Amino acid sequence: MKLFNIILLNSLFVLIIGCGGGGEATNPQEQIPSAPTVQPSAPDIDTWPSPSWEVVEPSEVNMDESKLKAALDYAFQAGRNTQSVVIVRHGVVVAERYKEGENKDTLATSWSGAKSFTSALIGLAIDQGYIGSVDDKACSYLERWSCEEVVCLSLDCPLSRPLISIRHILEMRSGLSPTDGISIYSDKDDQLLHSLERSILTKPGETYLYSNEDSMILSAIIRKATGLTTKDYAEKELFSKINMVGDWWTDKEGHTMTYCCIDSTPRNFARFGLLYARSGKWDGQQIISDYWYQESTKLADGLDNYGLHWWLYPSVNLIGALGLHTNDIWVYKDLDLIVVRNSVFTKYGTESVRTGQNIHVTTAPNNWNNTNFLSLVTDSIND
């Protein structure tokens, strides 16, 4: 039995590696969603899922049921490996579908969509005074990094970690050395130490390099600044505020995996999307400050589709918390529209701790195109 378990675990790692890496996002820039073909309507800001979601006929929010069905049919075609789709407009569920045998309470996982949750928590820590500024030196919150500048009199001075700001990390421009993308998830008991010990190769702020390790560093920054693990801080200051239940994984050493791995239901993921569709407000309360909402969802200087741990498409005012295998939360702010899509998900092991046989597996969709899918959704709007 032990031998069988070892073989199974090794097979699962091969599957993850073959599908693109643990928690690594697909490249959304290859499929930029098209603009909606309708004029945006004013959101009904008085409707909130507090505590449960209201389900209405699409016509009640000016959406065409047959066209929404076409979007769902696209998502659930054979080989698309879709576990769930939830579509929310004006604060109510207008369409949802689940794989046979699953339902609204079936867990899905975020993969790298968790990075956008981490961004929200950095903003909250700034709003609450735990972090001075997004431009603070990261070393100020990292015990393993010295903030002492390197004294160098030559023309070829080495780069040093004190140059790295929190903004650089959120923009994926830390300058730290790249990795293979999967090793942090597959074989590092202390994922934070692995992330912190990388050497610096390029000047911070100059070179974009998507990195799970960069995001993992934010786990330590949040812990040092707030006195709480990221998992606990999220529960206290984010999840509880929007009536969301989420299980955020940790590594073996107890560090929250801030680059990935929130297990929750699609309807719960839609709550986070609605928070951002409403500019950080929730049922009369400003959860995420307007400053941080604006700052985190604007393009970073020189980047085409990335902000502070959010994927961005300014031409259609669309933002995305996007994960491996199209485990995505799409937010059309102008349309007050949220689209959540998750792949077939299996959780192995008994704990939400990435060690031993505790592991995530999702199935990649075949012949999937974000533009085609999202266009079917937005084309259903009759405003």
Where do the PLM segments sit?
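Active-site-proximal alpha-helical segments within enzyme catalytic domains
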Residues: 214-221, 260-281, 327-344
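Structured C-terminal helix/loop/strand segments within mature extracytoplasmic catalytic/sensor domains
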Residues: 30-38, 323-383
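Active-site helix/loop module of the DD-peptidase/beta-lactamase fold
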Residues: 128-174, 226-264
